């Protein structure tokens, strides 16, 4: 019986010393294929991430072939702060996991063209982004943003409408916790849906 108590005590100590939460991040360099697949695919919920296609960047190398029509890749146009060692963390990479319509929107956005879509597009960004001016596309620095309109987002879902005018009259207030419009009045207007911990970067 004493031996049994000893085993139980050791098991309890071991469980107390174990990590409280394991996010599944692989050990090793952030330039590894394994780390990149983990970092980019976890921008979406598990039920999408596990069967999504993964690239190492827009127009980049295929890291994993998927089967569900969703694609995940890093979307930070600023690039890596330390290219030799890869993205510092998934937040810096700003990965997005989107459907086909979302990537039609993205392709137009980065070349300054009007998106042409067959239907609304959707994308998850559960690692958030590094900050945007909520009123003006392609503003990459807080210093260049309109006063009071800079938002560094935490986890969120986005909806890119086929018809941006359908969002007219919807709030642009990103502080309420409710869905809001980013880039209102432009061809790139879209809806941001905050989820748990959306404001964690604004409090740091």
Where are these regions (language model features)?
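Positively charged n-region of N-terminal signal peptides that target proteins for export
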Residues: 1-4
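C-terminal motif of bacterial Sec signal peptides marking the signal peptidase cleavage site
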Residues: 12-15
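Short, conserved catalytic or interaction motifs in soluble domains
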Residues: 18
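Primary mode marks residue(s) on the alpha4-beta5-alpha5 output face of response regulator receiver
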Residues: 22-204
């Amino acid at each position: 019986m004493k031996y049994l108590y000893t085993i139980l005590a050791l098991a309890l100590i071991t469980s107390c010393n174990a990590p409280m939460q394991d996010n599944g991040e692989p050990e090793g360099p952030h330039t590894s294929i394994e780390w990149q697949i983990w970092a980019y695919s976890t921008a979406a919920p598990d039920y999408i991430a596990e069967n999504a296609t993964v690239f190492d960047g827009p127009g980049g190398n295929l890291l994993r072939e998927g089967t569900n029509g969703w694609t995940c890749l890093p979307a930070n146009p600023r690039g890596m702060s330390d290219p030799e060692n890869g993205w510092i963390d998934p937040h810096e990479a700003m990965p997005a996991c989107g459907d086909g319509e979302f990537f039609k929107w993205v392709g137009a956005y980065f070349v300054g063209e009007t998106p042409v879509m067959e239907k609304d597009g959707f994308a998850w960004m559960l690692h958030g982004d590094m900050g945007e001016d909520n009123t003006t596309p392609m503003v990459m620095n807080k210093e260049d943003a309109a006063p009071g309109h800079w938002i560094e987002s935490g986890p969120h879902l986005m909806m890119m409408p086929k018809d941006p005018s359908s969002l007219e009259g919807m709030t642009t207030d990103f502080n309420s916790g409710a869905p809001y419009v980013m880039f209102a009045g432009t061809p790139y207007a879209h809806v941001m849906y905050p989820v748990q911990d959306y404001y964690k970067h604004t409090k740091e």
